[in-house]
């Protein structure tokens, strides 16, 4: 017989196991998005498979006819081990196993099945002590409350503070503690024989998870080094992304969510090609806007022009600009550009920021990550470009990176078509960057009328006001605008906010080249 006080403690168990269950689901979805890309597809698949596994676990519970309390505790301990170590082990397995997705979804099915077993078993344990209506209402209320806790804790505290690996281990520990606690709360329902062994296994699982928590940083570094192919020298997890910097004998590399952003060996080619064409067109630009580019490297190039009075950099993630100022190798590489008096840093979603203000700029440089998901894809939409157009002066120019026109031609030309549909005259150009291959850019200005100034479409002459470039020369600048036959325009529709075809193009084209 379970007394009234332990009954209330069992409700707390419901709250804990519900929170743990949703956290495991969120971890799987986040991990899949981080490693495989396309967050909408990955989360949709994870949620669907996980919910199906919950149902399968609930169905299986009918075949547990005896020793309910013992089976419940065994399930908690199994879930503690599998759920707690699932994320670290999947991180380690990713670069080594070709059939990683099968392993990922297999773990989701097993964890979901175990979670699906928990509540039916606990409800059957409680049914002898509560009326049916009271049992259902209380258990489900605590179950949904646990889901609320999980959904709030995960993005606000757990991922930014603990990271994915430690979050998984912490909730594995909670499951193990529920199991250990159950050996005392449910003592009247447990046979004395084997009880010490059950508690011993619970302590063993807790010990393993504590050891895993202590070594979580080492596990994370090993997994990322295997995935990224270099020694991790800096890592940070923000509410928006995972930031990692690797180093090899040639230099250091920045990765965001596992995707390479630049290599210090040849980043100057990319950033000179991004910045100097538009600054050569906007010869006397005084106010310059940089969207993205929190590494400070594009700003470094803009500050070469003495006539620039102010640079406003808008980057969503403070962790990125903190890296640019506090990680000494990057601070040296960007010339401490973000610390200059002429530079103002704004931490804001660029989509919202562009739509809220009215200050206008003489030149705009856009250095967003590639449109690999819908949250970034909105920054390449016609709606965004329409808003941005209102923040540009009449003679302003705009430069944007547009992924590779060779590897992803539909993605590249979709970006340009979107800008044209938003009222810009657009000129394509490209540059060879050894780390990335052929990389695409676009130079644009507001179209005044269908018969736009033809001089705009001519290759701009490299400004005589800039010095110290390592890549661009007057003849090199002209060559950027000479597209070969295999990079000619494609007939693709524009990218709209409510139909982000660009993200699908990008996933399709880059997925084929992985």
Swiss-Prot record:
<feature type="transmembrane region" description="Helical">
    <location>
        <begin position="169"/>
        <end position="189"/>
    </location>
</feature>
<keyword id="KW-1133">Transmembrane helix</keyword>
<keyword id="KW-0472">Membrane</keyword>
<dbReference type="InterPro" id="IPR030373">
    <property type="entry name" value="PABS_CS"/>
</dbReference>
<dbReference type="Pfam" id="PF01564">
    <property type="entry name" value="Spermine_synth"/>
</dbReference>
<protein>
    <recommendedName>
        <fullName>Polyamine aminopropyltransferase</fullName>
        <ecNumber>2.5.1.16</ecNumber>
    </recommendedName>
</protein>
<feature type="transmembrane region" description="Helical">
    <location>
        <begin position="9"/>
        <end position="29"/>
    </location>
</feature>
<keyword id="KW-1003">Cell membrane</keyword>
<dbReference type="GO" id="GO:0008295">
    <property type="term" value="P:spermidine biosynthetic process"/>
</dbReference>
<keyword id="KW-0808">Transferase</keyword>
<feature type="binding site">
    <location>
        <position position="295"/>
    </location>
    <ligand>
        <name>spermidine</name>
    </ligand>
</feature>
<feature type="transmembrane region" description="Helical">
    <location>
        <begin position="139"/>
        <end position="159"/>
    </location>
</feature>
<feature type="active site" description="Proton acceptor">
    <location>
        <position position="367"/>
    </location>
</feature>
<feature type="binding site">
    <location>
        <position position="241"/>
    </location>
    <ligand>
        <name>S-methyl-5'-thioadenosine</name>
    </ligand>
</feature>
<dbReference type="GO" id="GO:0004766">
    <property type="term" value="F:spermidine synthase activity"/>
</dbReference>
<keyword id="KW-0812">Transmembrane</keyword>
<feature type="transmembrane region" description="Helical">
    <location>
        <begin position="102"/>
        <end position="122"/>
    </location>
</feature>
<dbReference type="GO" id="GO:0005886">
    <property type="term" value="C:plasma membrane"/>
</dbReference>
<feature type="transmembrane region" description="Helical">
    <location>
        <begin position="40"/>
        <end position="60"/>
    </location>
</feature>
<feature type="transmembrane region" description="Helical">
    <location>
        <begin position="77"/>
        <end position="97"/>
    </location>
</feature>
<dbReference type="InterPro" id="IPR001045">
    <property type="entry name" value="Spermi_synthase"/>
</dbReference>
<feature type="binding site">
    <location>
        <position position="271"/>
    </location>
    <ligand>
        <name>spermidine</name>
    </ligand>
</feature>
<feature type="domain" description="PABS">
    <location>
        <begin position="211"/>
        <end position="446"/>
    </location>
</feature>
<feature type="binding site">
    <location>
        <position position="315"/>
    </location>
    <ligand>
        <name>S-methyl-5'-thioadenosine</name>
    </ligand>
</feature>
<feature type="region of interest" description="Spermidine synthase">
    <location>
        <begin position="198"/>
        <end position="453"/>
    </location>
</feature>
<comment type="pathway">
    <text>Amine and polyamine biosynthesis; spermidine biosynthesis; spermidine from putrescine: step 1/1.</text>
</comment>
<comment type="similarity">
    <text>Belongs to the spermidine/spermine synthase family.</text>
</comment>
<comment type="subunit">
    <text>Homodimer or homotetramer.</text>
</comment>
<dbReference type="GO" id="GO:0006596">
    <property type="term" value="P:polyamine biosynthetic process"/>
</dbReference>
<dbReference type="GO" id="GO:0010487">
    <property type="term" value="F:thermospermine synthase activity"/>
</dbReference>
<dbReference type="InterPro" id="IPR030374">
    <property type="entry name" value="PABS"/>
</dbReference>
<keyword id="KW-0620">Polyamine biosynthesis</keyword>
<keyword id="KW-0745">Spermidine biosynthesis</keyword>
<comment type="function">
    <text>Catalyzes the irreversible transfer of a propylamine group from the amino donor S-adenosylmethioninamine (decarboxy-AdoMet) to putrescine (1,4-diaminobutane) to yield spermidine.</text>
</comment>
<dbReference type="InterPro" id="IPR029063">
    <property type="entry name" value="SAM-dependent_MTases_sf"/>
</dbReference>
<feature type="binding site">
    <location>
        <begin position="349"/>
        <end position="350"/>
    </location>
    <ligand>
        <name>S-methyl-5'-thioadenosine</name>
    </ligand>
</feature>
